[in-house]
From Swiss-Prot:
Catalytic site positions: D126 (proton acceptor), R128 (nucleophile)
Name of the protein described by the UniProt record: GTP cyclohydrolase-2
Free-text cofactor note: Binds 1 zinc ion per subunit.
Species for this entry: Shewanella sp. (strain MR-4)
Similarity field: Belongs to the GTP cyclohydrolase II family.
Record EC number: 3.5.4.25
Amino acid sequence: MSIKYVATSKLPTPWGVFAMHGFEDTETGKEHVALTFGTLSSDAPVLGRIHSECLTGDALFSLRCDCGFQLQTAMQNIAETGSGFILYLRQEGRGIGLLNKIRAYELQDKGANTVEANEQLGFPADMRKYDMIQPMLEQIGVKHVRLMTNNPRKVKAMKEIGIEVVERVPLQVGKNRYNEAYLKTKSTELGHMMSEYHFTDED
């Protein structure tokens, strides 16, 4: 994989001004983004998140998933901490793309869960890859991470490229009546680490 750093700009947000670093995968044409806040240390653990693109959750406020809630909470946590990063990877629909994701949603509307829908379309449950994160982390100077995730595959991906995951910080937000079954499937079939309280009815 050939990841090329392109440019950096300021990104004002409701939580403060982040820096937005653009990267291009010259083999696939995919464009990825690293958001950083404050001064990042190469010696001390840095709060961060690997976030896969979710147009419906991140930009269209969908309640079918928890992605948008996780992104906003991660950005807020980073701003409150004073420093941190988000690697925003263009892997829509756990890697199957936007239109296939809509096809999968159609199957879910008919009763399939998120894993079954992917498989009925001929895809694995999760097609995401994380090999692009190494050059991105090298560019922003991060070697030790407090990783905001419920996904053990992301912890493994960090460790495999030599990044020390000092702490896994749970990110359990956004549960609602539209996504509760989806969250249960992520826990039971995709191995996401979520505590039982996340599935109890809210008052």
